A protein has these predicted regions:
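Amphipathic alpha-helical dimerization/coiled-coil segments
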Residues: 100-131
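Intrinsically disordered, low-complexity serine/threonine- and proline-rich regulatory segments
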Residues: 1-31, 38, 88-89, 97, ...
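N-terminal helix-turn-helix DNA-binding core of bacterial DNA-binding proteins
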Residues: 20-64
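Short, hydrophobic-biased segments on the C-terminal half of alpha helices
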Residues: 67-71
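Beta-hairpin "wing" of winged helix-turn-helix
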Residues: 73-88
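Short, contiguous hydrophobic alpha-helices characteristic of membrane insertion segments
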Residues: 20-22, 75, 127-128
Length: 131
């Protein structure tokens, strides 16, 4: 019997939704670090900022896994806490110096990879087989 997570994965595999999820997972850490390089932010603020900056095309509803991973690798740190008007604790995160270095590498790798993909997609068909 398949587990619930496997069933969900099977449902989106090979679909545009599945592709979008894979792309989001691959870029989430980079986007979090990009925002935190500008100023300390709390998680919900990051989600809203990404949604706004992408004109609603990117909606990262769960950044927590990426944030925990970035914190474990000491690329970000908890900066301070404040109480919101709704009596919720907001934990602000900031980027570390190692996080800045990691962000530069991520951006370089991302740009190199996406440029290579763009070059492939510009290729006119028919392709001739390699010999």
């Amino acid at each position: 019997m398949k587990k619930r997570k496997e069933l969900k994965r099977d449902k989106v595999a090979g679909t545009p939704a599945g592709i979008r999820e894979s792309l989001k997972k691959a870029t989430t850490e980079m986007l979090v670090l990009f925002l935190l390089e500008r100023k300390p932010m709390y998680t919900y603020e990051m989600m809203q900022t990404i949604k706004l900056m992408s004109d609603g095309k990117i909606s990262l509803t769960n950044l927590y896994i990426a944030i925990y991973r970035l914190e474990d690798f000491q690329f970000i740190r908890k900066d301070f806490e404040e109480l919101s008007d709704e009596d919720r604790t907001r934990i602000y995160f900031s980027i570390t110096e190692n996080g800045r270095l990691y962000l530069r590498r991520l951006i370089d790798e991302y740009r190199e990879f996406t440029q290579a993909v763009e070059e492939i997609l510009k290729t006119q068909f028919p392709l001739t087989p390699l010999e």
